[in-house]
Amino acid sequence: MSVKIRLARRGAKKKPFYRIVAADVESPRDGKFLESVGTYDPMVEPAAIILNEERIRYWMGEGATPTTTVKSILKKQGFSSNPA
């Protein structure tokens, strides 16, 4: 099973809200996920980002790879991608 850390869209039409989740690569975008590791709300200024860094480090240590968008969110938050 290959795992990605990616965004799962929630919210209403024209008002997106995202969960940052660890999910199997074969699961649909908004489908089943293994664990929710944060949230991202782009509709507020500045964007509201909440991360569970401990769990993100755990999943990256287990071999999960973040998507490009999640990588940029983690970088904005000053998150080191090195599992330690």
Swiss-Prot record:
InterPro entries: Ribosomal_bS16, Ribosomal_bS16_CS, Ribosomal_bS16_dom_sf. Keywords: Ribonucleoprotein, Ribosomal protein. Pfam families: Ribosomal_S16. One of its GO terms (molecular function) is structural constituent of ribosome. Gene3D superfamilies: 3.30.1320.10. SUPFAM superfamilies: Ribosomal protein S16 (SSF54565). PROSITE patterns: RIBOSOMAL_S16. It comes from the Bacteria. One of its GO terms (biological process) is translation. PANTHER family: 30S RIBOSOMAL PROTEIN S16, SMALL RIBOSOMAL SUBUNIT PROTEIN BS16M. This is Small ribosomal subunit protein bS16. It comes from Desulforapulum autotrophicum (strain ATCC 43914 / DSM 3382 / VKM B-1955 / HRM2) (Desulfobacterium autotrophicum). The lineage of its organism: Bacteria, Pseudomonadati, Thermodesulfobacteriota, Desulfobacteria, Desulfobacterales.
